[in-house]
Amino acid sequence: MQHVLLKSKIHRACVTVADVDYEGSIEIPSDLMEAAGIWEGERVLVTSASKGGRLETYAQAGEPGTGKIIMNGGAAHIIKAGERITIMAFAISENPVLPKKIVCNELNEVIRRIN
């Protein structure tokens, strides 16, 4: 039997920009994507710890080391700049998956890895 399992998690990241005029997606610095094992174009679930909103979109790699997490398109109406979010990606597997999880500070720097 196949199961949908958490494979990647960026916890407590902070949205720096919300741009409703962009075509869509969430832009995440490529160094954070790599640390969490999220691929360019991968479907992600984004939840807001600040206001409780949640949505699905796809990940777009941003400039590494900038700390800029940008909500684009319609998603920017749901989750806004300054909100603390969790970004998750999932895998379908017949076997257990050990997720790559990172925790960020308010500057979107990795402060802890949970594995």
Where are these regions (language model features)?
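Long, charged amphipathic helices and adjacent flexible linkers at domain junctions
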Residues: 1-3, 115
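Compact, glycine-rich, soluble single-domain proteins
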Residues: 3-5, 10, 14-16, 20-95, ...
